[in-house]
Swiss-Prot record:
Role of this protein: Catalyzes the formation of N(7)-methylguanine at position 46 (m7G46) in tRNA.
Region spans: Disordered: 1-21
Name this polypeptide is given: tRNA (guanine-N(7)-)-methyltransferase
UniProt KW keywords: Methyltransferase, S-adenosyl-L-methionine, Transferase, tRNA processing
PROSITE patterns referenced in this protein's UniProt entry, alphabetically: SAM_MT_TRMB (PS51625)
Binding site for S-adenosyl-L-methionine: E54, E79, D114, D136
Keyword match Coiled coil: no
Binding site for substrate: K140, D172, T206, R207, Y208, E209
Amino acid sequence: MPDMTMKSQPDRLYGRQRGHALRPRQQRLLDLTLPRLRYAGPSSLRGVSPLWLEIGFGGGEHAVAQIEAHPDVTLIACEVFENGLCSLLSRLLPEPLDEETAPLPGNLRVWDDDARPLLRDLPDQVLDRVFLMFPDPWPKARHAKRRFVHPENAATLARVMKPGAEWRIASDDPTYQAWVPEVMERQTAFELLAVSNERPEGWPPTRYEAKAIRAGRQPLYWRYVRR
């Protein structure tokens, strides 16, 4: 059972921010395209609604599917891993589209840093939906404080989510699957709507999900609502 008296989360990032060496086009996407989409702070959100947030978008499949399916919604997509950022940007601008001038979706903002400072800076009750899809599970007990599903982050999300807003979580890791309900049952600001071992309708698939299923791991999908 998780220790709810655990120490506060370290105010630093863990894990890699770069994998394999970037190819020339990937570097151009980071240098020329990313600045065009980068989230510019709370003042840039005036009049923006509905507003969704994805924490750790991985390869970007889910984020792109959501903005295409919901053009009336603005999505802030967070990812620190450079190769994941490049994957998202290349989905938006496949070759030979120009990295500096080709049109980009107007309902997407990208945050290429730790999501927690972004959350702390958001106004109260601004988010309509939050996605946490297959986060790093940090399965060792001594690393539990690094997991995003954590009492401190849940409290921050409770402040910035509107009443009735939904937090969607997915994980294929058994440790995380036990961790999520233990943490969330203690959060009075959230109510469990549903948990399923089948991906619900309206949840775009991701490569991480496909990889888990191929490896014989069964994902779980949670839907929590802000009371």
